[in-house]
């Protein structure tokens, strides 16, 4: 299932690129410095754009018991740029979290940097939408890997990015180049796509992202579905745990038609699920994920050997704003701090 370009193909690709492309990209540390994630991991999204008015990764880990985080988001400095910052902010360069990540690793944790996100995907500052130079996009990805010392990259593709066919192709071409570079340097790189979903599975444009990955020889380790914000009509309460299972099951069927050489078990292991604790962005408040839903999803993930669970986002994992929908800093339901992380954290191992 997980194919990589051979070094011969890599050399051919690099010869076809302009001077100053991948050949000039970041130099990796020893391969021994790159530690793969656990086979099953809970890695909630951490909203970097709340900095500096949010606890650090290390402080959050110490308070919550969480050890793995998905950092949202790396974005182009501005539309048309080929350089990356956290949240397109010049005050948050790529190495902004270096010391914090080192402290987190001392606790036994690690991070997954995530590219894109709704605001970048909507505004054109997702790096593959913004930059038209595939070799430079790949160099950016490689710099993230070497600067942060990570082994998994997450690509959150939604909004306008789902329909940007040129950006989709560039992203997957750059991923393929980066995978070949990582393989040549002994780095166990994993690629994760995070995509919006309905209970019937991925929309056609989400499927197209993955079909492009296959066409461009970009190996995808994980497909992470955003199991929230369905905007289901009506006011009846939606069972969000079962809705997530429905979405994951439907996605499994779709993946079988895209990754045609993979077994059913391998396809389940490709899947990941993101929940949104409490009230999601649908303002009527009938899409509410509670702790029972979270436990339902954990049991399903364990039974099917899914590779990752996460939430949007760890800063929301508290009951500080009961009744409020779509907050960045609280779930909107009555709960203790870290209830969702305590429930989902049992999945790691």
Question: Each PLM stretch: what is its role?
Answer:
Residues 1-31:
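Secretory targeting and sorting signals
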Residues 32-225, 229-258, 266-272, 276-292, ...:
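Chitinase-like catalytic core of GlcNAc-active glycosidases
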Residues 265-267, 303-304:
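A structural signal for short secondary-structure junctions
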Residues 286-308:
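Short, low-complexity, polybasic intrinsically disordered segments
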Residues 313:
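Residues that scaffold, gate, or flank divalent-cation-dependent active/transport sites
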């Amino acid at each position: 299932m997980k194919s990589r370009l051979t070094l011969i193909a890599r050399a051919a690709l690099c010869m076809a690129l302009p001077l100053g492309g991948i050949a000039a990209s970041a130099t990796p540390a020893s391969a021994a410095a790159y530690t793969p994630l656990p086979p099953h991991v809970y890695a909630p999204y951490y909203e970097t754009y709340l900095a500096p008015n949010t606890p650090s990764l290390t402080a959050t880990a110490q308070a919550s018991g969480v050890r793995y985080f998905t950092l949202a988001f790396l974005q182009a400095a501005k539309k048309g740029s080929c350089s990356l910052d956290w949240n397109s902010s010049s005050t948050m360069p790529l190495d902004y979290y270096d010391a914090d990540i080192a402290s987190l690793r001392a606790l036994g944790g690690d991070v997954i940097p995530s590219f894109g996100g709704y605001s970048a995907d909507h505004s054109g500052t997702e790096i593959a939408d913004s930059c038209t130079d595939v070799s430079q996009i790949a160099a950016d990805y490689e710099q993230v890997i070497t600067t942060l010392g990570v082994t998994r990259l997450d690509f959150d593709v939604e909004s306008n990015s789902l329909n940007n066919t040129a950006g989709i192709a560039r992203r997957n071409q750059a991923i393929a180049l980066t995978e070949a570079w990582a393989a040549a340097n002994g780095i166990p790189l994993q690629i994760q796509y995070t995509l919006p979903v309905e209970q019937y599975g991925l929309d056609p444009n989400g499927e197209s992202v993955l079909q492009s990955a296959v066409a461009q020889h970009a190996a995808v380790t994980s497909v992470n579905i955003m199991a929230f914000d369905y905007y289901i009509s009506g006011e009846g309460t939606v069972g969000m745990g079962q809705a997530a299972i429905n979405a994951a099951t439907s996605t499994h069927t779709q993946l079988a038609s895209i990754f045609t050489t993979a077994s059913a078990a391998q396809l389940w292991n490709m899947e990941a699920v993101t929940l949104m604790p409490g009230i999601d962005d649908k303002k009527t408040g009938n899409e509410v994920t509670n702790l029972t839903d979270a436990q339902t999803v954990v049991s399903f993930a364990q039974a099917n050997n899914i590779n990752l669970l996460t939430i949007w986002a760890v800063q929301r994992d508290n009951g500080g704003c009961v009744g409020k929908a779509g907050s960045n800093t609280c779930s909107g339901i009555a709960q203790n701090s870290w209830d969702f992380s305590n429930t989902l954290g049992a999945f790691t191992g």
